[in-house]
Structures are given as structure tokens and as C-alpha cells.
Amino acid sequence: MRALALDVGLKRIGVALCVDKKIALPLDAVLRKNRNQAANEIKNLLKIHEISLLIVGIPKGGSREEEMTRRIKHFVSLLEFDKEICFVDESGTSKEALGYGVANTRKKDGKLDSLSAFIMIKDYFAL
């Protein structure tokens, strides 16, 4: 069983992979030029890694929660993923990712976003 976690943002999408509910690792983030380009890159990952579960972070709380949730769910619909999709609370994952000390917050390369996705998948499977 393979799962992919997404931390969907307006400029970058953090991505993490979990294999057999045992091994999880962050992947390179997808840098968004537009929705269709980003959706196609994620579709490719779903196919290449033979994903059976998609875990997607949704913000809980905050003034823009409703708008971001709508945007994220619209993006997920573009993936045309016909297997299980689970939306999870992503609150605090970026702050926790900063604690790993790996991501350079000045660089906008998506490492922090993928670490956030990694934390979501780690928490989902209690790894």
C-alpha cells in the first residue's frame, strides 16, 4: 500500500510518500506555475508510485480557512484520483517542520512544504 501526502499551497505543493505504512519520506515539492501544470505533475506522481491513498492537508482555523479549503478541494478534483482521499488537519505542520532544522526558510524551494507533508503522513500512520 502506497500513500501520498500533499501540502497544497498557492505557490508550492509539498509532497511526501509512504510505503506499506512503514517508511515515509518527503519528495521534491511541486512548484506551481498554474493549476493544470501542478495537477499534471501530481497525477504523474500518483501513477509512477502506484498510489492507493491520497492524504491532503486542510487548514483548520484562521481567517482564510474556508477559501483555502475550497481551493484545495478544487485542486484535488483536478487530479481525477479515483481511489481513497483523506483530508487531514495540517495545522502546526509548518511550525513542526521548522523544528527539523533542514529547511532553509529563505529559500522558496518547497523543502519546508514537503516536510509538512511528511509530518502529515507520519501522523496519519502514527510512524
Curated annotation (Swiss-Prot):
It is found in: Cytoplasm. Its EC number is 3.1.-.-. SMART domains: YqgFc. Pfam families: RuvX. One of its GO terms (molecular function) is nuclease activity. One of its GO terms (cellular component) is cytosol. InterPro entries: RNaseH-like_sf, YqgF, YqgF/RNaseH-like_dom, YqgF/RNaseH-like_dom_sf. Gene3D superfamilies: YqgF/RNase H-like domain (3.30.420.140). The keyword Nucleus does not apply. PANTHER family: POLYNUCLEOTIDYL TRANSFERASE, RIBONUCLEASE H-LIKE SUPERFAMILY PROTEIN. Could be a nuclease involved in processing of the 5'-end of pre-16S rRNA. NCBIfam families: PRK00109.2-2, RNAse_H_YqgF. This is Putative pre-16S rRNA nuclease. It comes from Campylobacter jejuni subsp. jejuni serotype O:23/36 (strain 81-176).
